[in-house]
Amino acid sequence: MKILVFTDLHGSLNALKELTCSEDFRIADKRIFLGDVCVGCSRPNECIELLNSLDCIKILGNNDYYICDHIPKEEFTCSSEGKIAQMKYMQNLVTEENKKIVNSWSKEYCLNVGGKTLYFTHYPWENVNGEFNVVDDPIEKNFKTISELFSNVKADVVVFGHEHKSRCYTNGEKTYYCLGTVGLVSPGNYLIIDVNDNEINFEEKFINHDINYEIDLMDKAGYPYNRNKIKRAN
């Protein structure tokens, strides 16, 4: 079985179009999106509608949750003024119909194949007084701290996003794979998981897309975005 996993699209329609037109996307037995279709680039509605039309498992990201009128109070106290302005702008930009679509996505997905259990999520969630938020990142990232982060997950492989940096942590028996982002940079990355009998292989792949066009759209619209996270390609 070939599983294609991608994450952190962040409203980059060009990235999604390039990925869905790829041979890898076409021949994959299963496709899984790990969340954060919103907040970043300025075309979340188009991305949501295209994702919704695809044969693809969709998982809720923290920014997706926030734009569905669920911005936790903690986000207002610890986020920068620019981040809050961006989330409020996005809440107004995403249509009510698309919010309903996003709000229907699950926070996790589990797959049993080849005698192995694979677990997919955007990032670990916590419920504080009825408000969901992703947990804080560990200061030091290694197999021990990441395994503690997912201590309640019983799986052979855990695949997640959120951090926008690609990392793999393994002890030979259990693997934690953190994907980067397909949408915020070009080339963006995605993951092919090949499960054959009891063997699991990972191949990280890259796809070029016109991030400069997305940035031009945001500049023209006066959209508040983080220029440290979304950068022009050379």
Task: Give the residues covered by each predicted segment.
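Active-site neighborhood of phospho(di)ester-bond hydrolases with catalytic His/Asp-centered motifs
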Residues: F6-T7, R31-D36, I57-N62, T121, ...
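Beta-strand-turn-beta hairpins that frame and shape the catalytic cleft
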Residues: M1-L4, C110-Y119, N171-Y176, I200
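Short, glycine/charged-enriched secondary-structure capping and boundary segments
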Residues: E18-C21, E46-E49, P72-E75, V134-V135, ...
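Active-site environment of divalent metal-dependent phosphoester hydrolases
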Residues: H10-A15, V39-S42, N63-D69, E126-N127, ...
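N-terminal active-site segment of His-dependent metallophosphoesterases
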Residues: M1-L50, L54, Y223-N226
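Active-site neighborhood of divalent metal-dependent phosphoester bond hydrolases
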Residues: L54-C110, I139-S151
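Acidic, His/Gly-rich catalytic cores of divalent-metal-dependent hydrolytic chemistry
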Residues: Y169-N234
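His/acidic metal-ligating clusters that form di-metal
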Residues: F25-D29, V94-Y169, N228-I230
